[in-house]
Amino acid sequence: MRDRLLALAESARREIGGASELSAVEALRVRYLGKKGELSGVLGGMGKLPPDERRSLGEVANSVKAELEKLLAEAVERAEAAALEAQLQGPGLDVTLPGRGVALGSRHPVSRTMEEIVRTFSRLGFDVASGPEIELDYFNFEALNLPKDHPARDMQDTFYVDEATLGHAKKADSSALLRTHTSPVQVRYMLNRKPPIRAVMPGRVYRRDSDITHTPMFHQVEGLLVDKGVTFAELKGSLAAFVTAFFGSDTRTRFRPSFFPFTEPSAEVDITCTNCAGKGCRICKQTGWLEVLGSGMVHPNVFTSAGYDPNEVTGYAFGMGVERIAMLRYRIDDLRMMFENDARFLEQF
């Protein structure tokens, strides 16, 4: 058996030394050192040998195995070096060839919807403004006519940011939070500008809510127009123009009285159902109408917070959930599908 091991080692040395390709080296590894290789075949009968002879033969077998593993590793290095050299000696790169295009994914339905909303209002003459997502309680609530004891605060379950997380940015007399709407941007925008003002404010907002129609993070687009003599009729005209541009010229709008602390009067805006064209279906609960946004004339207290004289200027504001608009446009039943990163869903857009 010792002679068989030595003969196997000599044969393996010769063949490994002559192997020049990675595939050949791998084939030799399997042949000699694989589970069903020649070395395993020789060692299969060791159990029948006397203990002393078995110990001596085991030492020889381990030595042969270690040597073959080393030779195979060296052969792999030689084969890889030879392959690289052959590649370098081959045809060079033709820099005159046209470049290869990079495959890109499609736009996310929320991104596409928000961009189109902003683009539509830009064509109506609105600028685009933005603000911080970590907001002060004052701008998120108090400046929008929501004092600390206002019951409407309960309508928005809020994520507050603790002092340790916020660090030095926290003011001693203010609590910080993740903004629950993009309306704070309206106040910040007015504080830095004089009328007339016309702007939309897209962005992410956060509320402690999660179900089939709500997520803890979602997107809104707010709009604000301030000037002298602005009327509710102008609000209706602007939103009607947006609806027809976004949903189609056959889409009608309906205004319903509502309540928002930062507008007075306030109205919910409905459109004819995008699924049944107003005839009535399960999507619109047989009413023919779908709610899309809230709106109203800016409350005098909001103007006062922004340093405007409510006796000199008037204005209107509106806000819409981007995911809600996207669900209506693309007929998506479950809001959570937009945030699950399922390629089968996203590639449809």
UniProtKB/Swiss-Prot annotation:
Localization recorded for this chain is: Cytoplasm
Keyword Ligase carried by entry: yes
Q: Gene3D superfamilies under this entry?
A: Bira Bifunctional Protein, Domain 2
Q: Which InterPro entries match?
A: aa-tRNA-synth_II, aa-tRNA-synth_II/BPL/LPL, Phe-tRNA-synth_IIc_asu, Phe-tRNA_ligase_II_N, Phe_tRNA_ligase_alpha1_bac, Phenylalanyl-tRNA_Synthase, tRNA-bd_arm
Q: Which reaction does it catalyse?
A: tRNA(Phe) + L-phenylalanine + ATP = L-phenylalanyl-tRNA(Phe) + AMP + diphosphate + H(+)
Q: Which residues bind Mg(2+)?
A: E264
Task: Write out the entry's keywords from A to Z.
Answer: Aminoacyl-tRNA synthetase, ATP-binding, Cytoplasm, Ligase, Magnesium, Metal-binding, Nucleotide-binding, Protein biosynthesis
| Protein's name in the database | Phenylalanine--tRNA ligase alpha subunit
